[in-house]
């Protein structure tokens, strides 16, 4: 069985992205394989592709940091989900000691493809009344805002937070977090 994936072998614009075929791999013991139904497009991916992200991939590299789909294989240590579950995946949550998305996780866990293998701890069950498209696009803005507001700034209940511009998805997510 073949899997179409998107990868790139050098930094640049969208023209560096290429669709290649590879064999479908089996997940390792703590991973799941997802039949990708939808994926999110993110500014972080553009920055990664253009060479402006805090981490740089090892080439050739896969790409894609959020997706939704249906689990079709699970590793031997995975008990939190089962084959057939509809899930969201956010595999870019594999961090290094500086809390940056690691080059290894970028190369290994990109979700642009027919299937994607991701660590089981980076998936969440899809909300039943959400479409796959909605589920794939609902994560990064909130995680970006949470990282800045909660993880890095330690904002707590009753703290004051001012948004000088709230038109981006991350700012809208941030406003919902601090309510």
What residue spans do the PLM features occupy?
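Mid-domain Rossmann-like dinucleotide-binding core that forms the NAD(H)/NADP(H) cofactor-binding site
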Residues: 135-179
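A structural motif shared across PLP-dependent enzymes of the aminotransferase-like
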Residues: 106-120
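Short, Lys/Arg- and Gly-enriched loop/turn segments at beta-strand edges
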Residues: 94-104
